[in-house]
């Protein structure tokens, strides 16, 4: 991408919020994913409900949903949007890896990629926070946009 194609800079090369006034409202959807690696015992205790701070996945799910709704307060040039759907799901390998997936939907003038990415990131950080007393070596990695639909740029799907 050419630097002239970047939309978050004004003529003086300073940051600006993109003007979406004339864009049409369309359905926009984004899916993001992140993985947190931990000790086998940590994952087993999460599933058994034996983490002192409470139900890790329930709290992380709520944190991720809240994060999707608050993204514009965290990312400076991100537009405030009306989120019409935010969902967080979890999958694991039964050993040491817990994968977090978010789906965020809106009908609006701008996409929800940042909301989906923020949701999985905050969900992963919440898991870390709730389990750090027993496993400080957890690693959050491979946070990425899986898919996005809607808007001028159309559909994007990450390569498998």
Curated annotation (Swiss-Prot):
GO terms for biological process: Mo-molybdopterin cofactor biosynthetic process. The active site is at residue 129. Transmembrane segments: none annotated. It is an enzyme of class 4 (lyase). The keyword Lyase applies. It comes from the Bacteria. Substrate binds at residues 77-79, 114-115. The keyword Lyase applies. GO terms for molecular function: cyclic pyranopterin monophosphate synthase activity. Keywords: Lyase, Molybdenum cofactor biosynthesis. It catalyses: (8S)-3',8-cyclo-7,8-dihydroguanosine 5'-triphosphate = cyclic pyranopterin phosphate + diphosphate. Pathway: Cofactor biosynthesis; molybdopterin biosynthesis. Pfam families: MoaC. Homohexamer; trimer of dimers. NCBIfam families: moaC (TIGR00581), PRK09364.1 (NF006870). Belongs to the MoaC family. PANTHER family: MOLYBDOPTERIN COFACTOR SYNTHESIS PROTEIN A. This is Cyclic pyranopterin monophosphate synthase. It comes from Listeria innocua serovar 6a (strain ATCC BAA-680 / CLIP 11262).
